[in-house]
Amino acid sequence: MRSPRVIHLACVIAYIVAVEAGDKPVYLPRPTPPRPIHPRLAREVGWELEGQGLSPLSEAELLPEVRERRSPVDKGGYLPRPTPPRPVYRSRRDASLESELSPLSVAEVLPEVRERRSPVDKGGYLPRPTPPRPVYRSRRDASLESELSPLSEAEVLPEVRERRSPVDKGGYLPRPTPPRPVYRSRRVASLESELSPLSEAEVLPEVRERRSPVDKGGYLPRPTPPRPVYRSRRDASLESELSPLSEEEVLPEVRERGSPVDKGGYLPRPTPPRPVYRSRRDASLESELSPLSVAEDLPEVRERRSPVDKGGYLPRPTPPRPVYRSRRDASLESELSPLSEAEVLPEVRERRSPVDKGGYLPRPTPPRPVYRSRRDASLESELSPLSEAEVLPEVRERRSPVDKGGYLPRPTPPRPVYRSRRDASLESELSPLSEAEVLPEVRERRSPVDKGGYLPRPTPPRPVYRSRRDASLESELSPLSEAEVLPEVRERRSPVDKGGYLPRPTPPRPVYRSRRDATLESELSPSSEAEVLPEVRERRSPVDKGGYLPRPTPPRPVYRSRRDASLESELSPLSEAEVLPEVRERRSPVDKGGYLPRPTPPRPVYRSRRDASLESELSPLSEAEGLPEVRERRSPGGQGGYLPRPTPRTPLCRSRRDANLDAEQSPVSEGVVLPEVR
């Protein structure tokens, strides 16, 4: 570029030549101090022309364009304060274009370059000068170099252009940072080990598809200390599994089973070396597979590998943890003593619980003894007269899930096995029978609670209370022989009596007679017990058949219900034998069982309005004719339930219905009124 003074002199000379050519004297204006062209304008004009690939122009050609682009500041007034020269930095996009366009001619690419000029490169003031910033090679460039080594640039260049990330295409460079090394990712390391026996030409398409987005672009992170690549649990387990196989057979499976964690991403912060602990599943598999060949069992081993063993970082190192024998192992030893291992091993594999198949060992705790469960103790007493060979298959089927695996609980003081109420009741029932006849039934009736689980905390000895059902059965079964009633008694044993822990010891509780027992006594007085007993058994409610006794309370009297009082007044002229079946059918569920309420002051039986109205209706009728109607019209409220709280005595007022009935019945005979009442 020429200086502004030279340009000014050129303008004056051109003016003088033009005046001389016209042969006309023209006075020159008063000379003014020369004003230089601002350096910024000159730089912009020259820089734009050079960027478009044009040769530098002569001063004569450049002058008209310079005049048009003179800014108002340059046309008059004082010049702005000069600023230090600002260099034009090449953008990352320009650098990337140069590397891409090297094999192409500038003439072919120039139109594309003009269209792709960013607005930042086309004009405006340059930013404040900053220290030069180097262009770092991205991870994607490094990975592309390793991928494209066997290919020619001409084949790969179109693909490279399409895969250029927006970050690489333009914008200013970031602030300079300390040089950052490019670390090899775990995925690259794993790919190298996988692709060693294969040729790069075969694997390259697969490698391109498996490139993770993290490897494709972006700035490198801040440099950190080198991090070693730890062998994952999956690698260790694969080595032990693949030892008898060749790499060529296993490599496809290895590729499919590669976890996303092994395929890419940054390495974790360095930590102290962590040992690879053998999982419980590995230990159990070794003991199971000892009599089998590894080649036969390997497919099953691969299928049973848990997701925890397949990948992920190792946990922080912890003190070595011993593998405790589970309750299931102890129980299996006692069960399998008369059998050979070869017969039982398939069943053992199927019954391995998920807890025994993998996962980390728990924190070490003091040694815990294996307590014998109540089910084991009960089975011993049951199986004494039988041979183990006959009972062992049944024992295997009845093993509860609680006995099959899991960690042992914290050690607790030894807990005695208490006899359940069911055992006590069975003893009283089975006295006239031989054990050999009852033992199969006893096995079937063992409840799940008696079959396994931990023993409760030791408590003071608890007496076995006789339930209300036992007391009622004794009174019912007195005229019958035990041999006839025992089968029915077994069927009627409630689940509550069959097992479960005894409650905390409480003072002895008396067995109260229920309202149903009192009413049955009054009903059954003229009938023989032999006729009524089967029906009584069917009508025993579940509440009367078992359950714990309530806390002792002051003695509670048995109140007669309103229904009992009304039945007495109805049944007086009839024989109890005729009415008893109907009475049984009309017994409400409330009268059939349940605990007695808290004692309250005695409550009188009030006559309901319906009873009063029925009396007035039935006065002209014979009781024999009116009784069926009375029975049908008994309200549910009068048939049972607890009596209400006592209230001040209220007089019985005649209802409107009673008044209507009186008016209707007075002029009509009794025979005509009866159908109408019904």
Swiss-Prot record:
UniProt key word Nucleotide-binding: no
Which residue stretches does the UniProt record annotate as biased composition, category Low complexity?
145-157, 188-204, 333-345, 380-392, 427-439, 474-486, 521-533, 568-580, 615-627
Specify the domain of life of the species encoding this protein. Answer: Eukaryota
- GO cellular component: a single term: extracellular region
Region entry Disordered: which residue ranges? 58-97, 113-678
- Tell me one GO biological process term: innate immune response
Region described as 14 X approximate tandem repeats: spans on this chain: 1-678
Kindly indicate where the leader peptide sits in this chain: none
Listed transmembrane segments: none
List UniProt keywords, sorted A-Z. Antibiotic, Antimicrobial, Glycoprotein, Immunity, Innate immunity, Repeat, Secreted
Where can this protein be found?
Answer: Secreted
Q: List the disulfide bonds.
A: none
Q: List compositional bias (Basic and acidic residues) regions by residue number.
A: 64-73, 158-167, 205-214, 299-308, 346-355, 393-402, 440-449, 487-496, 534-543, 581-590
Q: What does this protein do?
A: Has antibacterial activity in vitro.
Name it.
Probable antibacterial peptide polyprotein
Q: To which species is this protein native? A: Riptortus clavatus
